[in-house]
Structures are given as structure tokens and as C-alpha cells.
From Swiss-Prot:
Keyword Hydrolase part of the UniProt annotation: yes
The protein, known as: Structural polyprotein
Stored Gene3D superfamilies: 2.60.120.20, 6.10.250.1030, Birnavirus VP3 protein, domain 2 (1.10.8.880), Capsid protein VP3, domain 1 (1.10.150.620), icosahedral virus (2.60.120.660)
Keywords: Capsid protein, Host cytoplasm, Hydrolase, Metal-binding, Protease, Serine protease, T=13 icosahedral capsid protein, Virion
One of the GO biological process terms: proteolysis
CC annotations in GO: host cell cytoplasm; T=13 icosahedral viral capsid
Amino acid sequence: MTNLQDQTQQIVPFIRSLLMPTTGPASIPDDTLEKHTLRSETSTYNLTVGDTGSGLIVFFPGFPGSIVGAHYTLQSNGNLKFDQMLLTAQNLPASYNYCRLVSRSLTVRSSTLPGGVYALNGTINAVTFQGSLSELTDVSYNGLMSATANINDKIGNVLVGEGVTVLSLPTSYDLGYVRLGDPIPAIGLDPKMVATCDSSDRPRVYTITAADDYQFSSQYQPGGVTITLFSANIDAITSLSVGGELVFQTSVQGLVLGATIYFIGFDGTTVITRAVAADNGLTAGTDNLMPFNLVIPTNEITQPITSIKLEVVTSKSGGQAGDQMSWSASGSLAVTIHGGNYPGALRPVTLVAYERVATGSVVTVAGVSNFELIPNPELAKNLVTEYGRFDPGAMNYTKLILSERDRLGIKTVWPTREYTDFREYFMEVADLNSPLKIAGAFGFKDIIRAIRRIAVPVVSTLFPPAAPLAHAIGEGVDYLLGDEAQAASGTARAASGKARAASGRIRQLTLAADKGYEVVANLFQVPQNPVVDGILASPGVLRGAHNLDCVLREGATLFPVVITTVEDAMTPKALNSKIFAVIEGVREDLQPPSQRGSFIRTLSGHRVYGYAPDGVLPLETGRDYTVVPIDDVWDDSIMLSKDPIPPIVGNSGNLAIAYMDVFRPKVPIHVAMTGALNAFGEIEKVSFRSTKLATAHRLGLKLAGPGAFDVNTGPNWATFIKRFPHNPRDWDRLPYLNLPYLPPNAGRQYHLAMAASEFKETPELESAVRAMEAAANVDPLFQSALSVFMWLEENGIVTDMANFALSDPNAHRMRNFLANAPQAGSKSQRAKYGTAGYGVEARGPTPEEAQRAKDTRISKKMETMGIYFATPEWVALNGHRGPSPAQLKYWQNTREIPDPNEDYLDYVHAEKSRLASEEQILKAATSIYGAPGQAEPPQAFIDEVAKVYEINHGRGPNQEQMKDLLLTAMELKHRNPRRAPPKPKPKPNAPTQRPPGRLGRWIRTVSDEDLE
């Protein structure tokens, strides 16, 4: 973030470290300028699961020191038992004096099984509680989920094998360094004496007040009577002190008091015990003071303390059984936790509870804590420290992002797999130049984009040192061509060269540069400092493109622009190509600075911003438009570009504007429209078309030529966009030559633009074209060569053929190929390609073509019946079906075109049920059940057939019902004893009857008459 020389990536290291602590530490970019060193400290613990299989891990995610948390196991009696504290690998107070926590993340999961266990069982609940540990009322496994209502601060029932990740997010900023309680030099009689310097910043003070004139009364007992004078919740994991005094009054002589303070841990056990008074005698009739002055160092606090208790033991000197003892007490105590009110020290806390894990399993806690550390004087001799860098833009951006963390899906507890998946999203958040693709998928892009616009540019007006950062993020990078390329105000001067939407009819200068200057894509290098055609040029490098933001749900049409230069009057040179978008309205804020302020008027008086102001645009538009360069396009959004492209003109842009004015789409149309494609034999420059084609392919777009004639169909954007939803790359050659969805006015506008004098060819180019046409008319061989050239270019194999020619200089391989190629109509040709002509593969229509032909057939049939509203587009929207009877009734009654797929139930009469006769049902059942001559169908099957006739209102079964009836018949035949007996099979050994045969063709039968 602070390295402003790298203009291609603007990373905010602080927020990257916050969201992904494993990427390492980063200095907090606030105004606390202390020399420090950055350090990452790991924490790794393998915690053994207790007998009940349940436990609780308490994390202090924001604690600025070595303490990370504590582990408790659940006992069979339902109580928690402290196991151990969780610390960083290095004891920071041993080497460092001061500390600031930058970021921290911890992961809890289990991947090991004890002996005899073959499945990894158990689940985890986790919650971040915006309070202190002592304030939790229910720490049971399920009760933790009620600790907060914020869905981003709790997760439940995560498998222990998957694990959870705890992320530390700051609750405050611009914090000072905290003293770590490090040892200080000290000399004493006791060699074990330790002196430490504890934090005194932001202490937390608990005040405990005894009720005035608290009355105690009891009878004497041997050993004294013990009562709890008070018990209060406190929170402490660092050193604390207790101060104050209590006043006791009594009227009984010889009373003796003893007082003890107990510091109790989260599990209810006593951690520290301090005797305040022992055998303290009370004087009757006076105020007896009992002072409290305790100091508990950090090293004695072996587990988190959550409460304090004061017990008083009352006895009597020489007391006898039955003697009365009474006194009253008043006063207050103050418990001070050193550094306890530092943001993150004691609150919030994150609790991770696991349940039903196999006994003896190991739960692993692993994580990293990143710190800013100030070493002690001894270590500072060998450790280099640096000042923190003040970066208000980065700090402001971080604050705004985390203030919207609930809306941006940034949680404090995560399933580990989900957190890993979100790392790419976090990288987008940390990179101010990222296009926010993943954020857009989650729906967070608008918020982050608004934060970027607010957080960084405003800073330059308050803090001048941050102005370069503001320009880089807000208004765009000043593309530095050198010192002379900027005016006194710091604003880059615009170039006078013009980018043109180049086609076969246009050859215009894009970047004004003399010979000797090398212009390659966006890299502009010059050897000296001349002024060329108004461009101030100086030694230097034109810096790379910087993406603006994405525009969501914006209708747009796209077209390519070829960036050219001119070496001489006849040979324009294509250098690069860029996709532009036509957006409705005045949207100069989306344009790069090099395009702003330039516009052209249309014939209807409207403006097109981003066009060069050359005359009048020969189009009639109904509104203003803006053309902007883009770097990428998605389903419903476009990513803008900051490339320093000057204003443009050209046929491709005019065609895209015409489409935009007619269709007015709600989302970008994923087709690159260009005027460089045609089918009339016009000579085209190969490099221009290839450059546009490559540019369209990089974005996954089709390169579409204009419709060359008017089609009598109305504009139907829904049908148009339905045909091209996924933009395959195999439609590159004139896919829209016969576009049936081009409305008449768009065609007329296109022809008007092509006929305008402004878009005629240059005289030199016209002369060259006429010369080539004349040569082709005179020389048939040259005409054939031009045809071959156009065929190669149209099919996109110019480069392939050129490479083939280099490998076959004598054309031997080509001659052999042509000699052995199948001829039109030959057997091999028909076997391979069907009956199509030579070299043309005979194929059936594509599904889209077949569907379109079907829609046309239905429409023509409806037209013959006088139903003129059923156009092919209407049929397509109606589910590729003709109008239903209800739609026809609606049209006949209202003479309004019915909406496709509308039922219009009000125009349909209820269908009368027609009952089939029993004879008809029996005949159908017999026909379905079996062949004639077999046994009659059973009554159960006849009933099934009758049900079908009843459902169909007297009509017979449809195909699906017929299948069901046939299956039913087969089942009944197999289990019906009344089925017809099988036909007897012929016996193989039985003699066959001799058929009456003829004696012969020439043998005459002797009759009785002959014998007479």
C-alpha cells in the first residue's frame, strides 16, 4: 500500500494480515510512530480429550501478549476442570518490553484416533461473546449458542475432523503499545526475587461496596463462625491489585476477626488465596479499620480468574457455648486489573466447545499471532527496528471494511473449510485494484466499491502526502510520460491522437507519432523529448492499465476498436484492439481520464460521449450514450478499463449504438459487433479482422457482422439474447449475416451510417481498391488469387496456410493433396460428406436451426388460418408451440395479441365430461389385455381401464396410460388362474397328413369314365 511505485497492484497489507494472519504481520498504518519489529508467533497444542468426550476452549483473540486462551475438560458431574493455559511458542516478556497485536487466527480440529477407535466422531460449537468471561451465564455445549444473536459470531455442529477457525478482528484502532510485564533489573536478599513492569494503561477497576451497617449475629462456636461477606465477578488474566478498607463496629467485648480473600477461576476452583487479617481483635464502641492492600503478579495467575470472594471468621476470646457474637460492617474495596480495559484484553472472548469426541482423542489447537514488538535494551543491540508508516488511506479503508463486516460476510468463527475458500475473497478485499469477481458472486461488490470510493480519494484533501494514492484509486492513475507530460496542476494532458473503430472503410490515425517512435500496445517509449502533433512526449514508460470498478446490471452493447498507427498513407498498421461498451446515459465517470470531455452529436441532437467531435454522427438516437473501454464482461456486469485510449469513431461503434438504441438491453449483449465483416467481396485488411477476432476471443465473445438487409420483424430482445447465451467461440465467420432479429430501423440506421460521406474510404485507399478490382477484371488468375485469399481469411486459416507454405516451398505436398482429394460427387466424397458439394460437409441442422425452422413452420400454418399474431418470435416465446384454444379465444374476443405462455382460463369453458359406454370399455380392455380368442380380461383390469376413461373424460388412454395398462395386464396374466390355456405344441414324432397333391403337370388323372 505504501509502495506507490507499484501501480499495478495496490495491496493493503494491514487488512490482508487481519483477514489472513498466516500471510504474516504488517505494521498498523496509524499515527503511532514507534520503532518496532514485526514478528509472527505460533501456538500449537495437542489437547487430550477427557473421559466424557467433551471440553471447552476459551480464546482471548484480542489479547496483546503471549496468552492465547485456556482449555477445560468436562467432568462426569457436569463441572468444568481447568487443564492448561494456551500461550505463544515464545515467552514474549522475556525479550520484549512493549507489544501491539496486529492479527491472530487459531484453528481447532481433531484428526487422530485413540487405540480401538475406528471412526472420527464428535462435533464443535463455537461462539464469540462480546463480553467478558465472567459474564457468561450458560457455558454448556448447546447453551453457548444463545450467547449472541449475531449469526457471524457463532457456528454449530461442525465435525471435529473439519474443525473451526477463530479470527481476531479489532474492536478499536489507533491503540498504543502495551507493557508486557517484562522483568526489570532488581537486587534483593532473596535470589528468587522477581520485579516486573506491568501495564498501567487502561486499567479495569471493580468497586465492591459492603452494605452500610451490615449486621452479623451468631452464637459462639469453637473454631469460629465463617461467613462470606461478599462475592463478586471479576475478570483477570494479568496482574491485579486490591485496595480499600472495611469498618467494623461491635458492642461485644473480645471479638476476634479473620479475613481471607479467594480468587476463583472459571471452573469454580480457588486459584489464589490471600489472608487479609488474622486474629484481629475488635474494640467495642469504636470504629475498627481493616485495610486491604494486595498485589497479585501475573505469574501467580495460572488460569483465568472470574470471581473474588471475601470470607470473615468470627470468634471470641474466652468464649463459651451460647455466647452472643455480633458486629456490623461498612466500606468498599477496589479491584484493579492492570491493562484489563485495553480493547481486546478481556473482551470479547471466543469459546469453542467440543462434544462426543472419543475418549483419549487429541484435539489440536494451532494458530499464529502477529505482533508489533519493541525489544528490551539487550535484544535491541542486535535487532533492527523500523518506524511504522503512516498511511491514512489504508487505515481508513480498513476501518470502513470492518465496520461493514456483517454485511460483507466477515466472521469471527468459521468452519475451517469455508475460511480456506474465502481466502481468495479476502485477497480481493485487500487489493484495491482487484476487479471484485468473487465479491460480485457473493453480492458484496457494491459495498466494497462504495468503500473504495469513500476511503481513499477523500484523504488527499486532508493529507497531501496521500494524494498519489488517492489518484491511483479514485480518479485513475496519471499515466506519466515524464515531467513535461503533466501540467502545472498535476493533471495529465490529453493526447491529440484518436483511436478509431477501424473497418474496411476506415483508416485513421490513432496515436500521433513520427517515424522512429515505437508504439506497442500500451507501452509508449520515445528516444527524445519532441512534441508530435500536440502530444507532449518525454522519456519514460506509459504505465500499465489499472482497472476501475465493475458496473453491475448495466445494459450494454459491445464492439472492438483497433488501435492503429500510420507508417505511410497506404499502409495503416494495427497495433492493438480494445473492446468498448455502449452504455445509456451520460456516464463520463466510468471513462478513463483520456476520454472525458469529448462527445459528438447525433442527427437527433443527442450526444455520444467518448466519440471524437468530428462533425455529426449520422444516426438518429432517442437518448444520450457513453462509450467506455472494458477489460472483461460477465453475465450481467462489465469491468471497466483505465487504459489511456483517446476518443474514438467508426462503423463498429455506430452499429453498436444502433443496436443499443433499438433493443435497450438490461444486461450486456455478449457479442462483439463490428463493421469489418461483410460478404460482398470487399477487400479487408487481414490484420484488422484478426486483431478484432483475437480480442473478442480473449473475452469469450463472438465477432458478429452486421445484417446487410432489413427483415420485417419487430425488436424482440428476449428472443435475441436467448439465441446466444453462452458465446461459444466457433461462430466467427459472419454469424449475423442473415440475422432475422435485426429490426428494420436498425438496418436503416446502419445503411445510413455506411452511406455517410464521413465514413467513405480515403482517396488513396479507394484508388488502391479500384486498381485491384481493375487488375482482377483483366487477369482471371489474379481474380482467382483474390478469391483464394478471401477464402483463407474468411475461414481463419491465413496463418496456418502461411506456415504450411514455408514448410512446402516447391508445393509438392500441396499438389499431392489436390491430386488425391475427392472430387465432387465421387463415391468417397458421398461417403464422407453425403450429397453436398465439393469440400462442403453435408450436415443436418443444428438444434437451434431446427427449432427456428419449426417455429417458422408453425407461424406459416397459423398465417394460412388467419392467425397473424403468431410470428416465429411469438411461437418461440410460447414454448415453441402454436396458440392454445384459450389464447385464440382471447384474441378473437379482444383483438389483442395474447401473452405467450398465458393460460387465459377465463376464456375457456369447463370441459364437459363424456362417459364411455360399458361396451366401449370392455372392447378396449379386451384389446389391451390380449389377442382375440384368449380369455376375457378380469374385472380388475376392466376397472382400471374404466378409471382411465373417467380421468380422460370419455377419451381413450394416452401413451403413458397405455404403458401402465400393458404392465398391469402382464401382472394380472401371471397371477390369474382364469387365463386362457396355452396352445398345444405340435408333437415332433407325429406323422404329418399327406396333403392332397397333384400327380404332375403332364400326368392326366384317370377317371372312371376313361375306364369305361
